[in-house]
Each structure stands twice: as C-alpha cells, then as structure tokens.
Amino acid sequence: MSAEVSHAASQILASGSERDPSYNDFSFIPFLRNSFGFGLACDVPVCKAYSEGHCPLGPACPDRHPTPSRVTTSTTTASGLAPSTTHGSLVCKHFLKGLCKKGLKCEYLHEYNLRRMPECQSFSRSGYCPNGDDCLYQHVREQARLPPCEHYDRGFCPLGPLCAKRHVRRRLCQYYLAGFCPEGKGCADAHARWIENLPKPSIRVEKTEEELERERILIREEQEREKEREREWRSERGRGGGFMRGRFRGRGRGL
C-alpha cells in the first residue's frame, strides 16, 4: 500500500503542474451560473440589453445580469481598493474563516472591514463580549449612540465636554461659510446647518462605576432568569406536561 502511495506522489511531483484552485468542478455550478448568474468572472461585461430592460437570451446570455441589490454603488472600497465583484458592500463570512474556495471569483468582499460588519448583539445588550478583541462584529460604545450636538455643529457649544450630546470634530468648510461651496454634498468638510431656535443644551449625567456594575448585574440576572424559564418550559414539553394536564376529569356514565 505504501509503495502505491509513493508511486502516486512521485507522479504528481513529476508532472510539475499545480492544480488550479478553481471551484468549477462542482456539479451545481452550471445551474447557479445559468439560473442566477453567480460565479461569473469579474471581467464579464454587463448585458446592455438587460440594462435597458429586457434580454431575449434570458439565463442563457453569456453576459452578467445583475439585480439592483447586487449592483455596487461605489467604485472603491473603504480600503481604497476596487471591489472584487458585484457584492462589494458585504464581507464574505467564509473569507473571515479562511474557508472561501472562490478566491477572486467570489461575489463578496474579501477584506476585514469592521465598518461593514453587523453590530455585536452580546456587546450591545450587556456591554460585554466573551470574544473580546477577537470578535468579528462591531462593538459600538454608548457614547457613539448619542445624537450629535447641534450647537457644536454650528461652531460652539457652551457646555463643552459636559454636554449630554456627542461632539463630532469636523472642520467647517470655509467656502460654505463664505456663501458657496463648489463641492456640494461631496465636500470633505462640514456644511453647518443654521437652524433657528435650537433647544438649550443639557449637562451630561455621568454614571458611577458602581451604578454601571449594578446595571450589568441586573442584565445578567435577567438573562439567567430567561434561560431558566426556557429550560423549565423545555423540560415540561419533554415530560409531556401541558397547561391542563391532570386537571380535567370527565363525567362517567350514569352520573
């Protein structure tokens, strides 16, 4: 047996050709390509007839038929690179685990970008995530959830760091302050909105560490009670128990 394995290995090494890590060997790839247009190369052009409204070839068309949800709205990603495919706004979950077999042909984004990842549910509920820094989802701090301060956006907030709202540090556009900015909405600086009768800013109420710890304990206790109720409910179902079990006794004959 070992001689056969050694002979097969020597043949592979003697061939000198590496196997192309393509995923076209799967039997269901032609069905996905013909039915949904998945797996097409990045350089395949978009069908002009389909873009105008109708393609007579339908699924048999060799060009791409992108749906509105799959069309990329920007030409670059957050890292400054061009999106690899039409799904440039979503991160490939298999790529994050090192298990994506499509490579450059993948319809999703192959880069680790926290701005495009969903929010961590565990961190948002209790302020604690068991995965810590290794978590692949966003950990949004409570300070980041505060609305922006209108007074600070206009140029000055009298409360400063004591303000209950968030102070977003952005440079005001000098052209916009002078009356006109040629960049419009695409300007990198801030265009202050001069809203009259702004509400008076309020002082931020900071919680002590003891209060925050009590809130975390209450959240954990509520989660434990919820798990206990679920375990009791599942155990009742396993024993065949019900709401009216053992409480109903029908009348016998002759009564």
From Swiss-Prot:
It holds the Pfam family zf-CCCH_2. It comes from Aspergillus oryzae (strain ATCC 42149 / RIB 40). InterPro entries: CPSF4/Yth1, Znf_CCCH, Znf_CCCH_sf. Residues 221-255 are annotated as: Disordered. It is found in: Nucleus. GO terms for biological process: mRNA processing. Component of the cleavage factor I (CF I) involved in pre-mRNA 3'-end processing. A zinc finger (C3H1-type) spans 41-68, 91-113, 114-142, 143-170, 172-194. Gene3D superfamilies: Zinc finger, CCCH-type (4.10.1000.10). Belongs to the CPSF4/YTH1 family. Keywords: Metal-binding, mRNA processing, Nucleus, Repeat, RNA-binding, Zinc, Zinc-finger. Residues 246-255 have a biased composition (Basic residues). GO terms for cellular component: cytosol; mRNA cleavage and polyadenylation specificity factor complex. This is mRNA 3'-end-processing protein yth1. Residues 221-239 have a biased composition (Basic and acidic residues). One of its GO terms (molecular function) is zinc ion binding.
